[in-house]
Structure formats: C-alpha cells, structure tokens
Amino acid sequence: NKEAVSIAYRGNIVDLLERLVERNINIELGSDQTSLHNPWAGGYYPAGISLEQANKMISNNPNQFKKEVKKTLVRHTNAINTLCEKGMYFFDYGNAFLLEASRSGADILNQKGDFKYPSYVQDIMGPMCFDYGFGPFRWVCSSNNPKDLEITDRITTEVLENIMSTSPEEIKLQMNDNINWIKAARENKMVVGSESRILYADAEGRMKIAEAFNN
C-alpha cells in the first residue's frame, strides 16, 4: 500500500542482525551509525551485556570492556557479511565502523586488503554532491536578528532558482533539494544558537550567493 513505516528496535543491533540471519530474512539496505570513533567510552556497546553492566565495566574493567567490544564487532561483521551475500547493500557512515572492525580481527577486508564495503561519502554522497563540487557552505548573521536570516533565505532562494534555470541535468536534483531546504528551514526551526544557515552549494552557488548578500 506504499505506506512508509518506521520501527525502532530497543536493544543491541548485533542481536537483531543475527536473528535476521537465523530466520533467513533478507534486508535490502544496511549501515551502522554508532560512535565507533570513540569505541572504549560508550560509543559502541557489546552484545550480551546490559547497559548498566557495560557502563560499570568501562569504569572498573576497561580492558575487559575492550575485549567484549572487539568480540561483538566480529559478530557484527559476520552478520553483515551474511546478509550482504543474500543481497543487502551495506555502506559505512564515516563513523570508523570498518576501521574498528578490522582492528578487531573481523572479516572486513577483501583479497586486495581494502575494506569490503564503501563509505557513504565515496559511494553515495560523492556521485550525488561532492563529485560536482557541492559541499557545506555556511553563513552567520552577526546581528543575531531572525529577520536578517529571513532576508538571506530569500536572497539565497532567488539566486539558486536563477542558477537552476540553466543548470545541467546532472545537478538539477541537488539544486532543487537546496531550494526546498532553504524554503523550509525557517518553518522547521533549523537554527540552533546563532542565526545561521548551512547549505550544500557548489562554487558557482557560493560566489553568487555571497555577491548577492553584499549587494
């Protein structure tokens, strides 16, 4: 019926992935967004241990906690590998999952010694944005006046719409996304702290928006 359904699982994802493998349930798309850039201080929790037990172990027995994390990363990788063999597309979110899995001795490298799976920057965001020069572009209203930010939103929208009218087909979708983002930013209260914006813009967009602000 084309209804979008989101289900939150409260637990350790490794237990869930292993159960999916056990029950032969195929998954189309997978990733990991744990904070594995900080694996030893709560960025990644081992399976088979409660949250309370794990937090105590971090303080009282950090070496054992590291061992448990590494064991879980091996299990995690094995489950991902099995699901990918059945057709799942897995990508790294840029959170050091591939790196820490390899350090833990998991089966995460191919025959050439490279990671088996791509990062989302390399495989998804690259072809969509970065390969065409799109990247984070920020501006801040030093007045901290919401009305000034509204003016910059209006100017940015006008500039992007003008650019989009002559843009090649390859970037029209990104340009349209940027316009929708700016138009909806105020309504969705995207400001945290200073009156500022962030936008994925290419070189032409950055220059023309900045010039329009100054004019």
Which positions does each model-derived feature cover?
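Domain-level detector for long C-terminal conserved domains
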Residues: G48-I49, E68
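Terminal or standalone catalytic/regulatory effector modules within metabolic enzymes
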Residues: G133-N215
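Long, well-ordered, tryptophan-enriched scaffold segments
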Residues: N38-G43, A47-G48
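Phosphate/diphosphate-binding loops
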Residues: N1-H37, N55-F90, G94-E169
